[in-house]
Swiss-Prot record:
Chain residues that bind heme b b566: 89, 188
The UniProt record lists the keyword Mitochondrion: yes
One BP annotation, GO: mitochondrial electron transport, ubiquinol to cytochrome c
InterPro entries: Cyt_b/b6_C (IPR005798), Cyt_b/b6_C_sf (IPR036150), Cyt_b/b6_N (IPR005797), Cytb/b6-like_sf (IPR027387), Cytochrome_b (IPR030689), Cytochrome_b_C_euk/bac (IPR048260), Cytochrome_b_N_euk/bac (IPR048259), Di-haem_cyt_TM (IPR016174)
Organism: Eryx miliaris nogaiorum (Black sand boa)
Additional information: Heme 1 (or BL or b562) is low-potential and absorbs at about 562 nm, and heme 2 (or BH or b566) is high-potential and absorbs at about 566 nm.
Record-linked CDD domains: cytochrome_b_C, Cytochrome_b_N
Record: residues binding a ubiquinone: 193
Source organism, top-level taxon: Eukaryota
Parts of the chain that traverse the membrane: 25-45, 69-90, 105-125, 170-190, 218-238, 280-300, 312-332, 339-358
Name used for this protein in its record: Cytochrome b
Bilayer topology annotation: Multi-pass membrane protein
Residues at which heme b b562 binds: 75, 174
């Protein structure tokens, strides 16, 4: 292990020659993480975690602080970029069988949960109308837990309703969690280099490797440059593209928005939650929509690692991608027909993919055996 760390240090780590552009998203996530920590620090310097001043402090940052508008937009749009990269990173892991590197996959799924928690806490901080009501709805799900739910919710809120103590602790959590993410990311990378990364063919690449630098460094830099270009263009020309109009109004506990929805990157999980009429089962489905990824390495039954040579699984994978998008779209709509039915069907298909994974593997194994 120390020998491998030395190789990483000097950019001489042997890497498979045939890894494609889909393997670049790990380094892009590292860049996103660094940018979020830096911009977040400069925003925290000017932010005030008080329900009467939080909204005004965001206005102050965007209007009065030199380049504050840029910091705020880079941080907000950077979070969206972070999630785009992480969803592609996970999709690549599913498609090419990277999840068979179990320790790396499990640490990565834990990272995703931490990242989603951090983003949720951050969304509450501007104390806009949608921030407040999204926080109320999501944290209120804890009350669905039998016996302990109400106590846990009161403990999280710091009172009997979302108020000043809630905002203070959410700011503290939003500040501290990224350091946990950085630590776990380091562990994730160390675990990856213990076995080495996979490749599109899903074969052992020990016989065909090249140094990471300069070959893959330049390949990574190209995608990184494109990401930075997209980020800066969005910040400059469409800074409010991901914002909810409701969030430009200060939080008002007496006025409920017509339609409560979190940021776009949570909509698939929120759509699954909304599609189930029961509160407890809805909360469980919400948790399962993420944690079910932990089961994938243990339900792989195929003799072939990559989906590149598995047509049945390819069909299922692209159905999953389409389902993810449909749930995200349906979650932006009001809770009424036909959107409730669409969400329920899409949610069922979403979970079916992960249940059908071992069955598809057995079918493919039998087809290969008899040919």
């Amino acid at each position: 292990m120390p020998h491998q760390q030395m190789l990483i240090l000097f950019g001489l780590l042997p890497v498979a020659t045939n890894i494609s552009t889909w393997w670049n998203f790990g380094s892009m996530l590292l860049a996103c993480s660094s940018m979020q920590v830096l911009t977040g620090f400069f925003l925290a310097v000017h932010y005030t975690a008080n329900i009467n001043l939080a909204f005004s402090s965001i206005v102050h940052i965007t209007r009065d602080v030199p380049y504050g508008w840029m910091m705020q937009n880079l941080h907000a749009i950077g979070a969206s970029m972070f999630f785009i990269c992480i969803y592609i990173h996970i999709a690549r892991g599913l498609y090419y069988g990277s999840y068979l590197n179990k320790k790396t996959w499990l640490s990565g799924t834990t990272l995703l949960i931490m990242l989603m928690a951090t983003a949720f806490f951050g969304y509450v901080l501007p104390w806009g109308q949608m921030s407040f009501w999204a926080a109320t709805v999501i944290t209120n799900l804890l009350t669905a837990i039998p016996y302990l739910g109400t106590t846990m919710t009161t403990w999280l809120w710091g009172g009997f309703a979302i108020n000043d103590p809630t905002l203070t602790r959410f700011f503290a959590l939003h500040f501290i969690l990224p350091f946990g993410i950085i630590s776990l990311s380091s562990l994730h990378i160390m675990l990856l280099h213990e076995d080495g990364s996979s490749n599109p063919l899903g074969t052992n690449s020990d016989i065909d490797k090249i140094p990471f630098h300069p070959y893959h460094t330049y390949k990574d830099l190209l995608m990184l440059s494109l990401m930075v270009l997209m980020l800066l263009m969005t910040v400059s020309f469409l800074p409010d593209i991901f914002n909810d109009p409701e969030n430009f109004s200060k939080a008002n506990p007496l006025v409920t928005p017509q339609h409560i929805k979190p940021e776009w990157y949570f909509l698939f999980a929120y759509g699954i939650l909304r599609s189930i009429p029961n509160k407890l089962w809805g909360a469980l489905a919400l948790a399962m929509s993420i944690t079910i990824l932990l089961t994938v390495p243990f339900t792989h039954t195929s003799t072939i690692r990559s989906m590149m040579f598995r047509p049945i699984m390819q069909l299922m994978f692209w159905t999953l991608v389409a389902t993810f998008m449909v749930i995200t779209w349906a979650a932006t709509k009001p809770v009424e027909p036909p959107f409730t039915m669409i969400s329920q069907i899409a949610s069922t298909i979403y979970f079916l993919f992960l249940i059908m994974n071992p069955i598809a593997g057995w079918i493919e194994n039998n087809i290969l055996k008899y040919n």
